[in-house]
């Protein structure tokens, strides 16, 4: 039962009962090399990932005190290199990559140049996202000359796919069209007034051209199933890929709900309170994730996406246990 997926379109059209998994990585911090990133991928590649997502991080402002005592504001990007990292992963491993393209911190020109770079590199699959608001902002503020919403970004990519640049000029030799996915939120986006409104926006992104969606992480499968049911009733037909992150530390009981705006189920919270160390919490997180994934596979969601930040070893253990049950195939070494 090896993974024969070669691109995201094949994955989305796969009508077999074969189980798949994918995962997300972050570009290295500015000044760091790729060794740690590649070690993490090396741990997970043996389980035949369908694709690897690479996040994009907007610039942020820091303040430095000058010699005269005044503060000077400087724009920095802590994790640059998304396009280069995506290309390096694709070349090194031959695994389909899906880099994030975001509105946050980017002008339309920035995005156009990024799309050109991706096209030159033969990268055809994208995740289109608005991106997070800046730390110092209460609400999302678009960059001057940038986009306010994902749908605006989608429109730019659609025009690019038609060979039209933002200045109205046209490509002499248009490349292959980008295929793109979007984010969705089983427990609604933090800025949405309610889940119904959030689902309307997901439907709009589908109508604009999105071909799949990946969820924010969640720990309660029933909330995910309810979300999918409501989405289908509202006309959302694109594949919805569930996103999972193993619970890793005791502190996450409080941090995760605030950071990712998702609930910790009462059963999981109760079990976590019995843990006496981070290692016990990590083992609990692995058990819970295995349980989640088995249940998702049983309900027909044959691709599960993992968020791996600070959790690579846990995801590896989850994969090992799924292999032991026969749900996934591991490469022979």
Where are these regions (language model features)?
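Short, acidic/polar
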Residues: 32-44, 108-115, 193-204, 285-295
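Glycine-rich, proline-tolerant flexible connector loops at the mouths of alpha/beta enzymes
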Residues: 28, 50-80, 133-145, 210-226, ...
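Flexible, glycine-rich active-site loops centered on histidine and acidic residues
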Residues: 108-156
């Amino acid at each position: 039962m090896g993974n024969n997926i070669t691109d995201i379109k094949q994955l989305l059209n796969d009508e077999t009962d074969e189980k798949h998994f994918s995962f997300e990585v972050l570009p290295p911090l500015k000044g760091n090399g790729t060794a740690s990133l590649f070690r993490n991928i090396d741990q997970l590649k043996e389980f035949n990932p369908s694709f690897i997502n690479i996040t994009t991080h907007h610039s942020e402002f820091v303040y430095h005190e000058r010699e005269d005592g005044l503060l000077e504001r400087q724009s920095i990007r802590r994790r640059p290199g998304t396009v280069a990292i995506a290309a390096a992963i694709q070349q090194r491993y031959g695994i389909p990559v899906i880099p994030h393209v975001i509105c946050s911190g980017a002008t339309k020109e920035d995005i156009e140049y990024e799309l050109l770079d991706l096209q030159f590199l033969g990268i055809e699959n994208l995740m289109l996202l608005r991106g997070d608001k800046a730390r110092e902002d209460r609400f999302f503020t678009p960059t001057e000359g940038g986009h306010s919403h994902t749908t605006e970004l989608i429109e730019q990519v659609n025009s690019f796919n038609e060979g039209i640049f933002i200045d109205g000029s046209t490509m002499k030799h248009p490349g292959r069209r980008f295929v793109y996915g979007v984010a969705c939120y089983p427990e609604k986006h933090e800025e949405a007034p309610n889940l119904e409104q959030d689902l309307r926006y997901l439907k709009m992104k589908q109508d604009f051209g999105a071909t799949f969606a990946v969820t924010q992480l969640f720990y309660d499968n029933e909330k995910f199933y309810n979300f999918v049911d409501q989405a289908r009733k509202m006309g959302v037909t694109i594949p919805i890929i569930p996103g999972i992150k193993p619970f890793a530390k005791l502190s996450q009981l409080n941090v995760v709900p605030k950071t990712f705006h998702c609930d910790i189920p009462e059963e999981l919270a109760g079990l976590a309170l019995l843990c006496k160390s981070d290692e016990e919490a990590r083992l609990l997180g692995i058990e819970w994730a295995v349980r989640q994934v088995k249940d998702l596979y049983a309900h027909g969601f044959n691709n599960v996406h993992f968020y791996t930040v600070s959790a690579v070893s846990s995801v590896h253990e989850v994969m090992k246990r799924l292999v032991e049950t026969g749900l996934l195939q591991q490469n022979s070494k």
